[in-house]
């Protein structure tokens, strides 16, 4: 089934839940930065089957980050640190829904379908704002993400 494709989200978000219930206000911006960085970085794994669960994790994170207003995208990602409380609420809801999903032993694809749909064999965000970002990021990654620079050329 699809459980492997929601497992990594469960693991990362479980850590976030532990933090939310024992948080330090001076770490809030760092937590948001790390979360955005992880979610964005995972988009590069889009076509690598062995790490599809990580890509799916990133799609869910991005959906939640956009939903909470924690990030916006207009040719570049902007992080709104004032949305921290909204972000926390969105993640608590998503994690509670995920726990209910596991308890009821429902098909994992039903949980994933809240955030992504499979088109031409690739999971893509359902939300248009998230999709616009993911498509732009992946096109840039394909164009320049695997280039290397020789030190002598600098």
Locations of regions flagged by a protein language model:
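An active-site-proximal "capping" alpha-helix that borders the catalytic cofactor pocket
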Residues: 4-20
